[in-house]
C-alpha cells in the first residue's frame, strides 16, 4: 500500500513507512519485533504523567504507530487524538482500541496538515521515537508547537548521536542481540540534545528538561536515567 495517499505532507521516507507498516500485525506483541518499545512505554508514560495532569487533557500523539502510548494516556483519562502516516499501523491501533474499550481518535494524517487545520488546539503533544525517522525533524517540531495552546507542553523522545548510541542502538540491538529488525535506525539521523534544544527554541518553545532513558535488554526493562548518551526524553513549554 502506498502510505502517502492519505496525507499531503512529503516529510517522510517511504522506506521508513513501509518498514514500520510491515511490523503492524505484531505491534502489540510484547515479545515480538517491538519488544523494546513495550519496555520503553511505561517510562514514556511516567515521564509525561508526572509533568501533566492527563485526566481531561486534550492530547495529540504524533507518529502514534500501533497506539501503545496513545492507549496508555487515554486509560489515564486523556482525550487523545493520535496520528500516523502508515494506514496499516492506524488500522491496527483502531482494532486494538476497539478490543480494549479505550477510546482514541486515530487518524491517517500528517502533523503539518493537522497544524494547518487546528492550530492551538491541544494541551499537550507527544512525539516519541519519530524525529529520527523523518527528513526534516524541524518541520515536525514547528507543527507540534503550532498545535499547542499557550502554556501547552511538548514531549519528545529520540536517540543521541554518540558512539555509545551507535554501539548499543544500532550494532548491539539490531545486529548482535537482534532485539530490533536490521535497518530500524540510521545513525546519521540521530539527534544531539543541543540540536533539539535549538530547534525547540526556534519554534518558540522553552526547553524545560532533558532526561535519559536507559533500556536494560537482559531484563527487558527500561528506566529514567541521568545518562543521555543513547535514548533520551525532553519536554518543552509554549509560553
From Swiss-Prot:
InterPro entries: SAM-dependent_MTases_sf, UbiG_MeTrfase
GO biological process annotation, one example: methylation
Binding-site residues for S-adenosyl-L-methionine, renumbered to this chain: 44, 63, 84, 128
Gene Ontology terms, MF aspect: 2-polyprenyl-6-hydroxyphenol methylase activity; 3-demethylubiquinol 3-O-methyltransferase activity; polyprenyldihydroxybenzoate methyltransferase activity
Record keywords: Methyltransferase, S-adenosyl-L-methionine, Transferase, Ubiquinone biosynthesis
EC numbers for this chain: 2.1.1.222, 2.1.1.64
Bilayer-crossing regions: none
Chemical reaction(s) catalysed: a 3-demethylubiquinol + S-adenosyl-L-methionine = a ubiquinol + S-adenosyl-L-homocysteine + H(+); a 3-(all-trans-polyprenyl)benzene-1,2-diol + S-adenosyl-L-methionine = a 2-methoxy-6-(all-trans-polyprenyl)phenol + S-adenosyl-L-homocysteine + H(+)
Keyword DNA-binding included in the entry's annotation: no
Pathway: Cofactor biosynthesis; ubiquinone biosynthesis
CDD domains for this protein: AdoMet_MTases
Described purpose of this protein according to its UniProt entry: O-methyltransferase that catalyzes the 2 O-methylation steps in the ubiquinone biosynthetic pathway.
Similarity field: Belongs to the methyltransferase superfamily. UbiG/COQ3 family.
Record's protein name: Ubiquinone biosynthesis O-methyltransferase
Organism: Xanthomonas euvesicatoria pv. vesicatoria (strain 85-10)
Encoding gene per record: ubiG
Amino acid at each position: 500500500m502506498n502510505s502517502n495517499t492519505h496525507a499531503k505532507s512529503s516529510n517522510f521516507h517511504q522506506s521508513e513507512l513501509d518498514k514500520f507498516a510491515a511490523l503492524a500485525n505484531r505491534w502489540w506483541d510484547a515479545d515480538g519485533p517491538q519488544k523494546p518499545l513495550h519496555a520503553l512505554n511505561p517510562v514514556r508514560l511516567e515521564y509525561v504523567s508526572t509533568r501533566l495532569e492527563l485526566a481531561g487533557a486534550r492530547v495529540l500523539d504524533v507518529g502514534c504507530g500501533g497506539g501503545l502510548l496513545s492507549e496508555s494516556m487515554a486509560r489515564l483519562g486523556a482525550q487523545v487524538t493520535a496520528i500516523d502516516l502508515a494506514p496499516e499501523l492506524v488500522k491496527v491501533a483502531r482494532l486494538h482500541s476497539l478490543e480494549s474499550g479505550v477510546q482514541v481518535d486515530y487518524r491517517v494524517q500528517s502533523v503539518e496538515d493537522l497544524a494547518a487545520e487546528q492550530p492551538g488546539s491541544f494541551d499537550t503533544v507527544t512525539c516519541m521515537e519519530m524525529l529520527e525517522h523523518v527528513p526534516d525533524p524541524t518541520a515536525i517540531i514547528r507543527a507540534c508547537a503550532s498545535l499547542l495552546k499557550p502554556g501547552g507542553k511538548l514531549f519528545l523522545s529520540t536517540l543521541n548521536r554518540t558512539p555509545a548510541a551507535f554501539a548499543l542502538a544500532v550494532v548491539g540491538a539490531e545486529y548482535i542481540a537482534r532485539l530490533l529488525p536490521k535497518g530500524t535506525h540510521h545513525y546519521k539521523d540521530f539527534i544531539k540534545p543541543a540540536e533539539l534544544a535549538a530547534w525547540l527554541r526556534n519554534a518558540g518553545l522553552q526547553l524545560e528538561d532533558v532526561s535519559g532513558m536507559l533500556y536494560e535488554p537482559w531484563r527487558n526493562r527500561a528506566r529514567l536515567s541521568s545518562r543521555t548518551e543513547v535514548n533520551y526524553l525532553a519536554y518543552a513549554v509554549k509560553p
